[in-house]
Amino acid sequence: NMAKGSVYYCSECGYKSVKWAGKCPQCGAWSSFEEVEEMPRDVKKATSSVSVASRASDIKVYEFKDVEYNKEDRYKTKYEEFDRLLGGGLLKGEVVLVTGNPGIGKSTLLLQVANSYKDYGDVLYISGEESPAQIKNRGERLKISGDGIYIMAEMDILNIYEYVVSKKPKVVIVDSIQTLYNSSMDSISGTPTQIRECTLKIVEIAKKYNISFFIVGHITKDGKVAGPKLLEHMVDAVFNFEGDEGLYYRILRSEKNRFGSTNEIAVFSMEENGMKEIKNSSEYFLSEREEKNIGSMVVPILEGTKVFLLEVQSLITDSGIGIPKRVVQGYDRNRIQILTAIAEKKLYLPLGMKD
């Protein structure tokens, strides 16, 4: 009866330590260590009763030339910008992590794309945060018929595993990974160990049975995925939802994509009946701009392979104190300092006494 050993995981970055620490040595977060009981190595060996020979017989190996692959084998939606971010559509067996602040529109967008994916087969929506009635209510507001979309209010990954393997839906949406747990482990849902183990199970199902997954992940105050950084390395693509609550638009940014280009962005607007993609985002961003405005300029910005036209505004006033102020929003402050110095030195603009 060997006792289980305790280790500590940082809830911010997943750093593992044998003893508790007030500050994480890897990411610098304070009071982020959580105690997790791990099974001793001897017990793991004892529980693994399957012989090496039988395990080897179950392993499938393919010769490179015999692997079948269809380049057009992607699920597409009615949202061209969303498909562009995925590299032309969702591949079979692909695992996509969608992150963002709570309430920014992750669940809404995924419910809308689920309405498109149902044309290829059954779509399973697993929710640990909302009841089926709440999801149905939101779906009706989004004008979703619901035929072919199944809702599952389950949080145990082992039960989810059995159901998905038996029914084999084409696409599965998990909302969210922080609510799932593995009942064979002692730790509660949301801990780094649980998030890692549940994601491993999801990736296993996806690759073994060619089932595509979307995983919703919450982010911390500093913009990182809540849970181990390892989570981002385990999935095929990471999309991050950006935008302030006061803005009508949302930006979906591709931060990682094994099957497409990274740093691509798609722009959506928040409407009464859900998310609406903005194809001509430059026109949208400049719609309220007045021409011949002093201190206003339109500049092209490259994001991935797409060019956006954005407005840059500047305001210069006499400084009332000896040290002039430099207030910057949406731009790197150090670069503004360099540009100001260049303008003063080379263009002879007296900005040294201007705010």
Question: Over which residues does each language-model region extend?
Answer:
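Short cysteine-rich clusters marking metal-coordination/redox-active sites
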Residues: 10-13, 24-27
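The Walker A/P-loop phosphate-binding site
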Residues: 50-142, 161
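Flexible beta-alpha connector loops of hexameric P-loop NTPases
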Residues: 72, 147-154, 182-196, 324-333
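Conserved nucleotide-binding/hydrolysis micro-motifs of P-loop NTPases
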Residues: 102-104, 129-133, 141, 155-159, ...
